[in-house]
Amino acid sequence: MRMRKIILVICEGETEESYVNLLKRWYKLPIRIVSRVAGTRVSPSFVEKWTNELKISREDDVQAYLMYDMDVEAINEKLRSCKAGLLLSNPCFELWLLLHAKDQRSAVSSDEVIKALRDSNPVWQRYAKSVFTDKQKDFLKEYTPIAIDRAMHLAEFDNPS
C-alpha cells in the first residue's frame, strides 16, 4: 500500500473553510485536503483525534494546519500548544482578502479590516462572511500573487499579518 498525503486544515469559522474549498477547486492538487470548522473548541486532543481519524494506514501522512484569526488571545495560547502548522491572520482572515485589493501596513481592528475591504473595490461592497460571489472568487484568483507579495512584507504575528 502506498502512502497517501492528506492535509487537514482546521478552521476557526466558515469563511476560512470556504476559502480552503476554493483553493481545492482551483489547484486540484494530488493530495487530499480536508477542512473542518472547530471554532473555540480547538485543542491538542482535538487536532490529534481528527488527524488519527483521517489515517487509513500507518503509511498515511496527515499534516495538520490551524487557520485562525489572532484577535482572541485565549485562542492563540491554545493554538500554540497544538501539534500543527499555524496559518494565522492578525487581526482576522479578512486581512488576507484585503491584501488582494490593497496594501495594509498599519495596525487595524477586525471591524476596520472589514470596512476597508468593502471600500477597497466594488466587488467587495456587499461582502458577507462565509460566502464568496463568483466575482469575488475571480478577483481572489487573479490577485493572489499580489496578495502574497504584500503579505510577505508584513511582520509575522504583528498586526497586520
Model-derived features: where do they sit?
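Structural motif
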Residues: 42-50
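C-terminal accessory helical subdomains adjacent to catalytic cores in phosphodiester-
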Residues: 1-6, 17, 21-37, 51-65, ...
